């Protein structure tokens, strides 16, 4: 069902493509897969302040090309490129091959589901009221051209003794429609009361052509999709039993 499955995984090969783009035989596949996991762990750990949304890994012949999608490219590069040189050396130690690191700037972080989820999680850790954080994120996304957005927050919200889930939605988010360009992001807030999960779905319009690279091309061109029927904001409280 469209509501249950990861929206990105459902659309792979239709209007989305994989973040690891390489082919390997049976003997090398497991090794390269573990390398990808290590590379992403290191980069996310080192670039916590850089607002990294995606890390795309490609492997041409005897090379490794890493593309970092970040809202703060200056933090990734560092002073005179010193930080990116350190990252290149660390990735080269893992892959034992020539490493090329490219940086792609995310010009509208308010329309990137991963960055929106991380922003809300950070606000929850700073004890900002969860309703205010969710409402602010919804308003920012709709103002910048999203056709719809849904945000779920679950856990001991506001320090309540009983965990619950609350969600806001504005516009429309057609999870069943395969041609819909839907971005999805997840983040975890580590609060003094326990962990709170944040999920974000952002609908940016429909992609009519059957092209796995369509979403990447759209991001490169800076398209966000028009502002369609926004409908009314909805909120729902579910108390855990």
Swiss-Prot record:
Q: Which GO terms describe its molecular function?
A: mRNA binding; rRNA binding; structural constituent of ribosome
Q: Which residues form the KH type-2 domain?
A: 39-107
**A biological process term (GO) from this entry:** translation
List GO terms (cellular component aspect).
cytosolic small ribosomal subunit
Compositional bias ranges of the Basic and acidic residues kind: 230-241
Q: What SUPFAM superfamilies does its record include?
A: Prokaryotic type KH domain (KH-domain type II), Ribosomal protein S3 C-terminal domain
Which stretches of sequence are listed as region Disordered?
Answer: 217-241
Q: Name one Pfam family in it.
A: KH_2
Identify the keywords attached in UniProt to this record, alphabetized.
Answer: Ribonucleoprotein, Ribosomal protein, RNA-binding, rRNA-binding
Q: Which InterPro entries match?
A: KH_dom, KH_dom-like_a/b, KH_dom_type_2, KH_sf_prok-type, Ribosomal_S3_C_sf, Ribosomal_uS3_bac-typ, Ribosomal_uS3_C, Ribosomal_uS3_CS
Q: Partners and quaternary state? A: Part of the 30S ribosomal subunit. Forms a tight complex with proteins S10 and S14.
Q: What does this protein do?
A: Binds the lower part of the 30S subunit head. Binds mRNA in the 70S ribosome, positioning it for translation.
Describe the family membership recorded for this protein in Swiss-Prot or TrEMBL: Belongs to the universal ribosomal protein uS3 family.
Its recorded name reads: Small ribosomal subunit protein uS3
- Source species, please? Bradyrhizobium diazoefficiens (strain JCM 10833 / BCRC 13528 / IAM 13628 / NBRC 14792 / USDA 110)
The gene from which this protein is expressed is: rpsC
């Amino acid at each position: 069902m469209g509501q249950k499955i990861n929206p990105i995984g459902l659309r792979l090969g239709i209007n989305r493509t994989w973040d690891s783009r390489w082919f390997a035989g049976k003997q090398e596949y497991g090794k390269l897969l573990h390398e990808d996991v290590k590379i992403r762990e290191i980069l996310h750990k080192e670039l916590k302040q850089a607002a990294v949304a995606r890390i795309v890994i490609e492997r041409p012949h005897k090379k490794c090309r890493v593309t970092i999608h970040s809202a703060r490219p200056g933090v990734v590069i560092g002073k005179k490129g010193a930080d990116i040189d350190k990252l290149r050396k660390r990735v080269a130690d893992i892959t034992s091959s020539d490493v090329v690191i490219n940086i792609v700037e995310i010009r509208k972080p308010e329309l990137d589901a991963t960055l929106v989820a991380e922003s809300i999680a950070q606000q929850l850790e700073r004890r900002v009221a969860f309703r205010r954080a969710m409402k602010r994120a919804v308003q920012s996304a709709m103002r910048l051209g999203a056709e719809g957005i849904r945000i779920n927050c679950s856990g001991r919200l506001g320090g309540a003794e009983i965990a619950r889930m609350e969600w806001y939605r504005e516009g429309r988010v057609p999870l069943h429609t395969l041609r819909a360009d839907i971005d999805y992001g997840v983040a975890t807030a580590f609060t003094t009361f326990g962990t709170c999960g944040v999920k974000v779905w952002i609908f940016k319009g429909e992609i009519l052509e059957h092209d796995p690279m369509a979403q990447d091309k759209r991001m490169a061109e800076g398209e966000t999709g028009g502002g369609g029927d926004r409908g009314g904001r909805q909120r729902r409280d579910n108390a855990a039993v």
